[in-house]
Amino acid sequence: MKKRDQAIGFLVVFLAAGMLISCGRSREVEQDAEARVEEAFTGNGITDFEKMDLSAYEQQTGVALVDDYVSYHFFYESDGLAIEAYLGAPRELLEQKKPSDCLIYNHGGNRDYGALEGVETTFYAYQYQTICVASNYRGCGKSEGTDTFGGQDVDDVIHLVDLCEKMPFIDGDHINMLGVSRGGMMTYEALRADDRIHRAVVVSGLADSFMEYEERDDMKEVYRELVGGTPQELPEEYEKRSATYWADQIDTPLLIFHTEADDRVPIAQAEQLAAKLKAAGKEYQFISDGAGGHGELSKEDVEKIRQWLLE
C-alpha cells in the first residue's frame, strides 16, 4: 500500500469511528477563517501558500470536512531555507475571538520517507479538536536543504513555534507538540532547546540513537549518511540525538506512549527515558501497551491524549 493510501486509510478509520466532537456549535464570528489565515500568513512574510481542497477526504470519510475545516499548504523560512508546511483547523476555532490551543505535529521517517502529504494536519485537527501545524523538515518533501536527522533541522521545528506565536488565532501560552517515531526525537530536542511548549506527547519516539544504531541494521546507513558517521566516530552527535542522556533538561510535561511489540524503536528506549525523567523529578506519564505496533494508538490512548492536551 502506498504511503498516501495509508494516510487516508488511517484518517478514515479515526474519523468514521465517531470519536470526535462536532464543530457545528453556534459561535460569534470574528472574521472569515480563510481571510484570517491568509492575513496572518502575509503579515508574517509568507506569500507562498494555497488553500487545500478537502473534498476528496470528505468523500472518503463521510464527514463534513469541507464545511467545518480549513487546510493550507505553505512555506516558511528557517535558517534561510524554504520549509514546506501545512495547517489544518476547525473553522470554528479560526473564526472565534478567543485565541485557541495549537498542536505542532512532528512526523517520522527520514528524507522523503514519511514526508507529510497534506492529510495529517486535518486528521489531527479533527481528532484532537485543535489547530494543527506541521512541517516537512529540511531535505524532506518540497523543503529546501539537507536532512540531518535531529541536527540543524530541529531549527525548523523551533521556527514553526516562532510562527505559531505570531498567529492571532493561536494562544501562544498553549502551543502543544506531538511527535511520532523520529518526530519523537525532534520533539525531545525541541523541548530541550525551547521552553515555550505547553505540553508534549510522544508516540513510539526515538529516545536513544546509540541504541537505535546498534539494534537496527537498516538504520546504520541512515545514521552514517545523515549524521555523518558512527557512534564511535561522532559520540557528541549521537548524544545530541538521545534524550536519555539529558532527560534532566526537559521541563515540559510529557506523555509517552510505546508498545511492547514495537520493532522499529524498541520499548527499552522509552523505559530508560522514563526512568531518567523520574530520577530527575520531571512531570511525565509513561504508558506501555502489549498490543499494537510502531506508532499505533488505541481509542483509549487517543482519548487520553485529548484530555492531556486540555490540561
Residue spans of the language-model regions?
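C-terminal catalytic histidine-bearing segment of alpha/beta-hydrolase fold enzymes
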Residues: E271, K278-E311
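N-terminal cap/lid segment of alpha/beta-hydrolase-fold proteins
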Residues: K51-Q96
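Alpha/beta-hydrolase fold nucleophile elbow
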Residues: I170-S181
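Alpha/beta-hydrolase active-site loop
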Residues: T148-P168
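Mobile cap/lid helix-loop segments that gate and shape the active-site cleft of serine hydrolases
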Residues: A115, F210-W246, T252
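Short beta-strand/loop motif that positions the catalytic acidic residue
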Residues: I250, I256-H258, D262
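Short substrate-entry loop that stabilizes the transition state in hydrolases
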Residues: L94-S100, Y105-G145, F210
